[in-house]
Amino acid sequence: MDIQHDLVIAHKYKIIQCIGSGTFGNVYKGVNVKTQDNIAIKMEDKRTSYKLLKRETSIMKYLYEHHCRNIPAVHWFGPVNDYMGLVIPFYECSLIQYRKIKSITLSKLNAIMTQCVSILESIHNNMVIHRDIKPQNFMVKQGELFLIDF
């Protein structure tokens, strides 16, 4: 996937660097040029994954609007040249990365698992099932967990 760095999306979101890649596309760290807030931009090929990314966006918006615990806000979703883009808040690291950089005590592990269960309970109460639960899909920001990749 060839996305130019410094590309500005929707006159607001600037791509800084690629921070991950997956089956259908890449995730970039970016910045909101108006507020200077860091954001994450998921870019996927329009031809192969439009429906999947649109579905993911719809689920995240639905859960966020229903006050589900720790679901990212969708800042923007739409076409970017031959790609579809999804802009959400930027998170420090995934739970798996967090485990590698932080020493996790038993009490901290208990708190993390309690947060995970609480997030899952919240989405299940809204009739949504996440089909890819794994540490890489729990993101950390200021010690709080967020579930991504619906």
Residues of each region from the PLM?
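A short, low-complexity linker immediately N-terminal to eukaryotic Hanks-type protein kinase catalytic domains
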Residues: 1-15
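Conserved N-lobe ATP-binding subsite of Hanks-type protein kinase domains
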Residues: 26
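ATP-binding glycine-rich loop module of kinase domains
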Residues: 33-54
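Structural motif at the C-terminus of the N-lobe alphaC helix and the adjacent alphaC-beta4 loop
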Residues: 59-69
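Short beta-strand micro-motifs within the conserved protein kinase catalytic domain, predominantly
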Residues: 73-84
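Structural motif in protein kinase domains
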Residues: 91-100
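Activation segment signature within eukaryotic-like protein kinase domains
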Residues: 112-113
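Catalytic-loop of the protein kinase fold
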Residues: 124-140
